[in-house]
């Protein structure tokens, strides 16, 4: 057998080319399949420039501050759809203004929606009896943690809900939900 001169030998063989093509295709498919998974765990922020999501009422309509305050008296705690569609309490302060924080209504024990009991002035979970004070701090188990907080902002009369990442003012700890 005669040996070919170095200038006649191709730099990449057919097998090497097919291996690179197969690897490139598999990598593209894997990255394409991982995008929805990554987007699920790290969703893009929805909403305006403040990064907030517009609160929605039980019919899915955007909540406005003037409309909400005209129908809800001081001290009222009523549910809206907040972050990720979770039920979130909007609190009407004594000075006829919407409070600067909201309370996520999902119980930290087993995920039931916790109703506000105005007679007892606390949230009482119907599933296993966990109780939370007026600010959502756990006062009686079996729930291990306080209810999650959200920021409430008013922008051009729209009520915006955004993630609470600062220290939890009720406990002085880092927020467990952030």
Swiss-Prot record:
The UniProt record lists the keyword Coiled coil: no
Binding site for [2Fe-2S] cluster: 107, 109, 125, 128
Catalytic activity: 2 oxidized [plastocyanin] + a plastoquinol + 2 H(+)(in) = 2 reduced [plastocyanin] + a plastoquinone + 4 H(+)(out)
SS bonds (residue pairs): 112-127
Transmembrane segments: 20-42
Limits of the Rieske domain: 71-161
Entry-linked InterPro entries: Cyt_b6_f_Rieske, Rieske_2Fe-2S, Rieske_2Fe-2S_sf, Rieske_Fe-S_prot, Rieske_Fe-S_prot_C, TAT_signal
Entry note: cofactor: Binds 1 [2Fe-2S] cluster per subunit.
GO terms for cellular component: plasma membrane-derived thylakoid membrane
EC number(s) from the headed UniProt entry: 7.1.1.6
Keywords: 2Fe-2S, Disulfide bond, Electron transport, Iron, Iron-sulfur, Membrane, Metal-binding, Thylakoid, Translocase, Transmembrane, Transmembrane helix, Transport
Domain of life of the native organism: Bacteria
Membrane topology label: Single-pass membrane protein
Gene Ontology biological process terms, A to Z: photosynthesis
Subcellular location: Cellular thylakoid membrane
Summary of subunit composition and partner proteins: The 4 large subunits of the cytochrome b6-f complex are cytochrome b6, subunit IV (17 kDa polypeptide, PetD), cytochrome f and the Rieske protein, while the 4 small subunits are PetG, PetL, PetM and PetN. The complex functions as a dimer.
Functional description taken from the UniProt entry: Component of the cytochrome b6-f complex, which mediates electron transfer between photosystem II (PSII) and photosystem I (PSI), cyclic electron flow around PSI, and state transitions.
Family indicated by similarity: Belongs to the Rieske iron-sulfur protein family.
Further information: The Rieske iron-sulfur protein is a high potential 2Fe-2S protein.
The protein's name: Cytochrome b6-f complex iron-sulfur subunit
Species whose genome carries this gene: Prochlorococcus marinus (strain SARG / CCMP1375 / SS120)
Gene it is expressed from: petC
